């Protein structure tokens, strides 16, 4: 334990927090190109085929990104926008695709939480 004098001379070193999405480099989103689009299976209690893509970002990082929503139009060489946010049951997936921007289409026939999936408002039926 330091003495008062030692604290006056040196002070306490503040702890630096480690980023949960280092590839974004403090940016809200990053652009990248899909190098591989595939499905993968989640961790133990869950079972599904989750859609993911390996993306090479403009800053040189290569990351795995989750494609949310039902159905997508992505393939190799698609230009996409990546945001932070991990997928709890997919190890190594720390980023999400932004739907409805660049080459990524929004989710079709989406009625609720549309802004999260890049879906336009449906025309009102008369």
From Swiss-Prot:
GO molecular function terms noted in the UniProt entry: rRNA binding; structural constituent of ribosome; tRNA binding
GO biological process entries: translation
Keyword Nucleus part of the UniProt annotation: no
Modified residues (3-methylthioaspartic acid): 89
Compositionally biased tracts (Basic residues): 113-126
Domain of life: Bacteria
One GO cellular component term: small ribosomal subunit
Entry keyword set: Methylation, Ribonucleoprotein, Ribosomal protein, RNA-binding, rRNA-binding, tRNA-binding
Chain spans, region Disordered: 1-26, 101-126
Keyword match tRNA-binding: yes
PROSITE patterns per the UniProt record, alphabetical: RIBOSOMAL_S12
PANTHER family: 30S RIBOSOMAL PROTEIN S12 FAMILY MEMBER
Family: Belongs to the universal ribosomal protein uS12 family.
Record-linked HAMAP family: Ribosomal_uS12_B
Quaternary structure note: Part of the 30S ribosomal subunit. Contacts proteins S8 and S17. May interact with IF1 in the 30S initiation complex.
Protein's job: With S4 and S5 plays an important role in translational accuracy. Interacts with and stabilizes bases of the 16S rRNA that are involved in tRNA selection in the A site and with the mRNA backbone. Located at the interface of the 30S and 50S subunits, it traverses the body of the 30S subunit contacting proteins on the other side and probably holding the rRNA structure together. The combined cluster of proteins S8, S12 and S17 appears to hold together the shoulder and platform of the 30S subunit.
Full protein name: Small ribosomal subunit protein uS12
Source species of the chain: Burkholderia pseudomallei (strain K96243)
């Amino acid at each position: 334990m330091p003495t008062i004098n030692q604290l006056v001379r040196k002070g306490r070193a503040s702890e630096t927090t480690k980023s949960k999405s280092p590839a974004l480099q403090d940016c809200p989103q990053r652009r990248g190109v899909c190098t591989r689009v595939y499905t993968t299976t989640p961790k133990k209690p869950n079972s599904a085929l989750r859609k993911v893509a390996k993306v090479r970002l403009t800053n040189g990082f290569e990351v795995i990104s989750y494609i949310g929503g039902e159905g997508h139009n992505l393939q190799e060489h698609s230009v996409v926008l990546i945001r932070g946010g991990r997928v709890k049951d997919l190890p190594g997936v720390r980023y999400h695709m932004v739907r409805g921007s660049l080459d990524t289409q929004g989710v079709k026939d989406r009625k609720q939480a549309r802004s999260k999936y890049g879906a336009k408002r449906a025309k009102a039926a008369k």
